[in-house]
Amino acid sequence: MNPSFFLTVLCLGVASAAPKLDPNLDAHWHQWKATHRRLYGMNEEEWRRAVWEKNKKIIDLHNQEYSEGKHGFRMAMNAFGDMTNEEFRQVMNGFQNQKHKKGKLFHEPLLVDVPKSVDWTKKGYVTPVKNQGQCGSCWAFSATGALEGQMFRKTGKLVSLSEQNLVDCSRAQGNQGCNGGLMDNAFQYIKDNGGLDSEESYPYLATDTNSCNYKPECSAANDTGFVDIPQREKALMKAVATVGPISVAIDAGHTSFQFYKSGIYYDPDCSSKDLDHGVLVVGYGFEGTDSNNNKFWIVKNSWGPEWGWNGYVKMAKDQNNHCGIATAASYPTV
């Protein structure tokens, strides 16, 4: 990655005062609480309800504008409904610069005519969508996703790999568990360690309070290093087409992303430099009949299958590196 970004997480803060609530939304609120198993103290419930109502209004207004053709994607209420955008960014995202070892540089194949669309989920390269929970471990999920794809390419077998192994054991390489990390640091740990355990043998706990429990006999993957991709969408496209799923970092801190549901995500406020979330590009394509318009990246997130488009997001492609999708792309070598 160049420049490097450190994906991290901060503490959750809760404000106290709450404005007047809309009684017409009582049934919707109680249904949302039941769906997401929320239980609050008396003082907190009013505040959370007020935050939820504000988010619902933002979502409803956006979708009204979507129906008028002003946006290319829909939003929907989800598990983040009772979080302010500031809390959402603090819990799920955040970054700081960090020096780290550089990988090999990706050399774009010159004589390869890449296809107009690619979807590695249809080729067996991608495990089901996972959920990082209230832990800033997006970097680990992005890293395992890329390695799962490369191991499938090499062996023909798709094995879910252990994010918890990375969370617990890669601090020496510069990662900080639930407080953040880098995909390249994860790839370096796997090389240094000589392997990574399977998800089945080392299940995810969404916490970083345990000591490293790597078991060599349960190792299901290894890598020999990693490759950094030049900061261009054309280079990323060639890598996705010829290599497989690619780890990337994006600016995911906007309310529009917090409540993304479907369509091609584009937010004019999205930064190509202020990256705060690690995800996995598993393909690209276009909507309609014109392959030069409505282009998108297929991105696997780690917020569970209920978020977004069954856990995925279509992100605008060839729109000046929108949200920084090509700024910090890399993959492991096996």
From Swiss-Prot:
Keywords of this entry: Cell membrane, Cytoplasmic vesicle, Disulfide bond, Glycoprotein, Hydrolase, Lysosome, Membrane, Metal-binding, Protease, Secreted, Signal, Thiol protease, Zinc, Zymogen
Disulfide bonding pattern of the chain: C135-C178, C169-C212, C270-C323
GO BP annotations, alphabetical order: antigen processing and presentation of peptide antigen; CD4-positive, alpha-beta T cell lineage commitment; collagen catabolic process; elastin catabolic process; enkephalin processing; protein autoprocessing; proteolysis involved in protein catabolic process; zymogen activation
Signal peptide: 1-17
Modified how: During export along the endocytic pathway, pro-CTSL undergoes several proteolytic cleavages to generate the CTSL single-chain and two-chain mature forms, composed of a heavy chain linked to a light chain by disulfide bonds. Autocleavage; produces the single-chain CTSL after cleavage of the propeptide. The cleavage can be intermolecular.
Active-site residues, record numbering mapped to chain: C138, H277, N301
UniProt cross-references to Pfam families, sorted A to Z: Inhibitor_I29, Peptidase_C1
Main enzyme class: hydrolase
Annotated Zn(2+) 2 binding sites: E163, E199
Subcellular localization: Lysosome; Apical cell membrane; Cytoplasmic vesicle, Secretory vesicle, Chromaffin granule; Secreted, Extracellular space
GO molecular function: cysteine-type endopeptidase activity; endopeptidase activity; metal ion binding
Job of this protein: Thiol protease important for the overall degradation of proteins in lysosomes. Plays a critical for normal cellular functions such as general protein turnover, antigen processing and bone remodeling. Involved in the solubilization of cross-linked TG/thyroglobulin and in the subsequent release of thyroid hormone thyroxine (T4) by limited proteolysis of TG/thyroglobulin in the thyroid follicle lumen. In neuroendocrine chromaffin cells secretory vesicles, catalyzes the prohormone proenkephalin processing to the active enkephalin peptide neurotransmitter.
Protein known as: Procathepsin L
